């Protein structure tokens, strides 16, 4: 019997949500803190599955840290160089792409013998473009099951030099190379093949590397230059900003059924590109106010939009369900990389939107949504994908309830999401 949660129709949303730490920032910061010289105290760390997988891996690799009882403050003792496994190891990383990709690169420094593996879905998430680039730099990597996919056996050997990486599937491959390159013996020049997707996520990586004392130069995101033989240095304390992708659900809820909702922990100074989601809501007709460490959204008459959302792929999913409440159709374009996330998000989104009555055209890299006159009650499959569960909670902002199957899958980034949503919701 699969777990389910039925959300009753909501009349109004109003209030403030303090966001959990960003997943993208948390796992990058943990890895850099481990590689750095000195001790780093990370605050507002995300407590979630993905971060737990990174912490477990670092511990197995001999990194010592102290985690607070609420798991949101972590004091990491850096090793001041590459991570070295004292014996052959197998690390299980669940379905955490933000742990798998950066660790796959970092463990190619020196001479390790480490296997990285994960859940069945992880073995369907491509990593070939990263492996190709690491091999160009001298890394010894074997595929243990299917070519181009985890599990991987890593035996060190990455020295740097000239490498080319395909940027068209995931920016995490470039992120992994960037974070590893400063510790290589030689300087590294990373050439990007194809169109670089999700560029703002690269800015998060460069910001964090700078925070830990390493500068990267690039020629308009086409070629990146990183000096070798560097050392990351702990900044001492680092505050992880709130998760901008997680903010999207609350901001969209306010746009549909506000009141006014304020999310704190992100704002106009945020390093995350997903804060641009607020601009999309504004284009659709919502009212947005920006503070240094908050974004506020109030209800407006929403209109459908047609937009390239390659720069905000995770938050763009929220637009697909917000579109159910807009006047006219919505088209979200250039989102092929939805297909290689926690699930094939394009197929999943199309299937579930049709269940609630929308007319949907699913293309190779776009989705076109025509909202129904009235939403239908449905059981929503979540595909073990945290974002599917959170996106479809918005259906309850109508006069129709919605049932979310396996609601606990939000644990990947936001374990108490449904409690937070209930806290700002007034039932019809």
UniProtKB/Swiss-Prot annotation:
Q: Which CDD domains match?
A: EPSP_synthase
Q: Where in the cell is it found?
A: Cytoplasm
Q: Which reaction does it catalyse?
A: 3-phosphoshikimate + phosphoenolpyruvate = 5-O-(1-carboxyvinyl)-3-phosphoshikimate + phosphate
Q: Which GO terms describe its molecular function?
A: 3-phosphoshikimate 1-carboxyvinyltransferase activity
How would you summarize the oligomeric state and partners of this protein? Monomer.
Q: Which keywords describe this protein according to UniProt?
A: Amino-acid biosynthesis, Aromatic amino acid biosynthesis, Cytoplasm, Transferase
> In its UniProt entry, what is this protein called?
3-phosphoshikimate 1-carboxyvinyltransferase
Q: What Enzyme Commission number does this protein have? A: 2.5.1.19
Q: Which residues bind 3-phosphoshikimate?
A: 23-24, 28, 170-172, 198, 314, 337, 341
One cellular component GO annotation, for this chain's record?
A: cytoplasm
Summary of the function given for this chain in its UniProt record = Catalyzes the transfer of the enolpyruvyl moiety of phosphoenolpyruvate (PEP) to the 5-hydroxyl of shikimate-3-phosphate (S3P) to produce enolpyruvyl shikimate-3-phosphate and inorganic phosphate.
- Please name every pair of cysteines joined by a disulfide bond in this record: none
Q: Name one GO biological process term.
A: chorismate biosynthetic process
Q: Which HAMAP family match?
A: EPSP_synth
């Amino acid at each position: 019997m699969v777990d389910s949660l039925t959300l009753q129709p909501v009349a109004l949303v109003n209030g403030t949500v303090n966001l959990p730490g960003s997943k993208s920032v948390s796992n990058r910061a943990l890895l850099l803190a481990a590689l750095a010289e000195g001790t780093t105290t990370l605050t507002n760390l995300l407590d979630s599955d993905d971060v737990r997988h990174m912490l477990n891996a670092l511990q197995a690799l001999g990194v010592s840290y102290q985690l607070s009882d609420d798991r949101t403050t972590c004091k990491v003792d850096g090793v001041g160089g590459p991570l070295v496994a004292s014996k052959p190891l197998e690390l299980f990383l669940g379905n955490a792409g933000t742990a798998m990709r950066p660790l796959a690169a970092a463990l190619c420094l020196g001479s390790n013998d480490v296997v990285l593996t994960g859940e069945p879905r992880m073995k369907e998430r491509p990593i070939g473009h990263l492996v190709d680039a690491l091999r160009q730099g001298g890394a010894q990597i074997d595929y243990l099951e299917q070519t181009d996919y985890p599990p991987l056996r890593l035996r060190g050997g990455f020295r740097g030099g000239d490498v080319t990486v395909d940027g068209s599937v995931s920016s995490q491959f470039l992120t992994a190379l960037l974070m590893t390159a400063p510790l290589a013996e030689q300087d590294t020049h990373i050439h990007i093949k194809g169109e670089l997707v999700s560029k703002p996520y690269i800015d998060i990586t460069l910001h964090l590397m700078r925070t830990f004392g390493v500068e990267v130069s690039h020629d308009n995101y086409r070629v990146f230059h990183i000096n070798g033989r560097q050392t990351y240095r702990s900044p001492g304390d680092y505050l992880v900003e709130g998760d901008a992708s997680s903010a999207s659900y609350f901001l969209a809820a306010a746009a549909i059924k506000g009141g006014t909702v304020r999310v704190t922990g992100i704002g106009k100074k945020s390093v995350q590109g997903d804060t641009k989601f607020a601009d999309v809501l504004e284009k659709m007709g919502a009212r947005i106010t920006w503070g240094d460490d908050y974004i506020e959204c109030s209800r407006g008459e929403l209109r459908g939009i047609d937009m390239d959302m390659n720069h905000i792929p995770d938050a763009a999913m929220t637009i697909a369900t917000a579109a159910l409440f807009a006047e006219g159709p919505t088209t979200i374009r250039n989102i092929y990389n939805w297909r290689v996330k926690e699930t094939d998000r394009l197929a999943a989104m199309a299937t579930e939107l049709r269940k609630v009555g929308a007319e949907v055209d699913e293309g190779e890299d776009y989705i076109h949504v025509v909202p129904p006159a009235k939403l239908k009650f449905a059981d929503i499959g979540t595909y073990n994908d945290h974002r599917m569960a959170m996106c479809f909670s918005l259906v309850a902002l109508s006069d129709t309830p919605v049932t979310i199957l396996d609601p606990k899958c939000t644990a990947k980034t936001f374990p108490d999401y449904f409690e937070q949503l209930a806290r700002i919701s007034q039932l019809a």
